[in-house]
UniProtKB/Swiss-Prot annotation:
N6-carboxylysine modifications at: 193
Keyword Magnesium: yes
Stated name of the protein: Ribulose bisphosphate carboxylase large chain
HAMAP family cross-referenced by the UniProt entry: RuBisCO_L_type1
Gene source species: Alvinoconcha hessleri symbiotic bacterium
Length: 471
């Protein structure tokens, strides 16, 4: 018997609230934090989010009868209270994998964080976490190369990599920019980098900048016998221009390029990652604009979701925050998304804000890049927090050294001392001060850096904290 079409407005709960539903292995699972408008029941709010982010609209439509709505609809299957927050609650929603185009993080985001975020019945909405089923993960190409391949390309093993963002970030001519790159690489760094807003400005057009940077890299490599690199930012006004810059970087021998994946867009980023894989070029990812989306604890997208999206879209490095520097970052939450970048399988762990198990299959891991207000005194904590597969990037903490290019040498000595102490079984965060003092006895560069920044701290409370019960 044909189904009967009943016109009119139907309560979302009748179709999209399914507390008895058991999610399938192939379902994409999402956890939303919801604050409904006054008078809107929780059950209605969670069902509305499931509807508006999948197949629903505000009224019943006759075209529902032309498809298998039960197969395609999102299902709100559970809710939980948010510890310490009486207004908010968590809603867990399962989406059938067929709702999403294969390999398209753009399509996933368009559904999960699209129109639903402007829904009037919801006062605040935040996407806290997503479980991507392995069946979907395997449709994405992911990082162009990954951690192990990068170590092989750069011939660097057994320690975090060391970098520096060239400062001032804007205003240097191409020749002076190249000089700064050379001094940093010659002093002992593995990488230098463009900052996120270095593109092609009147003071330094991109091609001139690329040429002087490659000249600096080649000179530093000849003098040190080490592989060196600089993240050449190919973010551009159009995809065609972006690929033109990437092609030129490859032509002149650059080992690594850079992209601002949020401001540049996920379509551009996924395409660039595929190009890097095909052309043997490493890809560093900057997260400029992330805090607009993730810093508000009640509305937006949590950074752990942006981390997962980047791993699917593609990048060999991603900025993750530092915990100890000048930028926002809760320690346990940061450790959580670092694991989501690097590990093959991550278990649910609410103490670190991870709501779902996540299986990445054979997808390569991503280097965690930490930068922002860090200096030599932070080195013991950074090596402890980030471990081996990280890029520690000191901008002002390199170029702010009173002796100029000695800042690079100071950071290299501090890193080597901490890695050696770690390998000998020392607890770096407890013994770090003594480790650095001992190393400084043989390094005037490190000693001066320690004296310069001994009073510098960034002691501000984290805005976006993990949701835990107030004591």
């Amino acid at each position: 018997m044909a189904k009967k079409y009943d016109a009119g407005v139907k309560d979302y709960r009748e179709t999209y609230w399914m507390p008895d539903y058991t999610p399938k292995e192939t379902d994409l699972l999402a956890c939303f934090k919801i604050i409904p408008q006054p008078g809107v029941p929780r059950e209605e709010a969670r069902a509305a989010v499931a509807a508006e982010s999948s197949t629903g609209t505000w009224t019943t439509v006759w075209t529902d009868l032309l498809t298998d709505l039960d197969h395609y609809k999102g299902r709100a299957y559970a809710i939980e209270d948010v510890p310490g927050d009486e207004e908010a609650f968590y809603a867990f929603i399962a989406y059938p994998i067929d709702l999403f185009e294969e390999g398209s993080v753009v399509n996933v985001f368009t559904s999960l964080v699209g129109n639903v975020f402007g829904f009037k019945a919801i006062r605040a909405l935040r996407l806290e976490d997503v479980r991507f089923p392995i069946a979907y993960v395997m449709t994405c190409n992911g990082p162009p190369h990954g951690i192990q391949v990068e170590r092989d390309i750069m011939n660097k093993y057994g320690r975090p990599l060391l970098g520096c963002t060239i400062k001032p970030k804007l205003g240097l001519s191409a020749k002076n920019y190249g000089r700064a790159v050379y001094e940093c690489l010659r002093g002992g760094l593995d990488f230098t980098k463009d900052d996120e807003n270095v593109n092609s400005q009147p003071f330094m057009r991109w091609r001139h900048g690329f040429d002087f940077v490659m000249e600096a890299i080649e000179k530093a490599e000849r003098e040190t016998g080490e592989r060196k690199g600089h993240y050449l930012n190919v973010t551009a006004p159009t995809p065609d221009e972006m690929f033109k810059r990437a092609e030129y970087a490859k032509e002149i021998g650059a080992p690594i390029i850079m992209h601002d994946y949020i401001t540049g867009g996920f379509t551009a980023n996924t395409g660039l990652a595929q190009w890097c894989r095909d052309n043997g070029v490493l890809l560093h990812i900057h997260r400029a604009m992330h805090a607009v989306l993730d810093r508000n604890p009640h509305h937006g997208i949590h950074f752990r979701v942006l981390t997962k999206i980047l791993r699917l879209s593609g990048g060999d490095h991603l900025h993750t925050g530092t915990v100890v520097g000048k930028l926002e970052g809760d320690r346990e939450a940061t450790l959580g998304w670092i694991d989501l970048l690097r590990e093959s399988y991550i278990k649910e762990d609410r103490s670190r804000g991870i709501f779902f198990d996540q299986d990445w299959g054979s997808m390569p891991g991503v280097f965690a890049a930490c930068s922002g207000g860090i200096h030599v005194w932070h080195m013991p904590a950074l090596v402890t927090i980030f471990g081996e597969h990280a890029v520690l990037q000191f901008g002002g903490g390199t170029l702010g050294h009173p002796w100029g290019n000695a800042g690079a040498a100071a950071n290299r000595v501090a890193l080597e001392a901490c890695v050696e102490a770690r390998n000998e079984g020392h607890e770096l965060e407890k013994e770090g001060k003594d480790i650095l003092i001992q190393a400084a006895k043989h390094s005037p560069e490190l000693k001066t850096a320690m004296e310069t920044w001994k009073e510098i701290k960034f002691e501000f409370d984290t805005v976006d904290k993990l949701d835990v019960a107030h004591k």
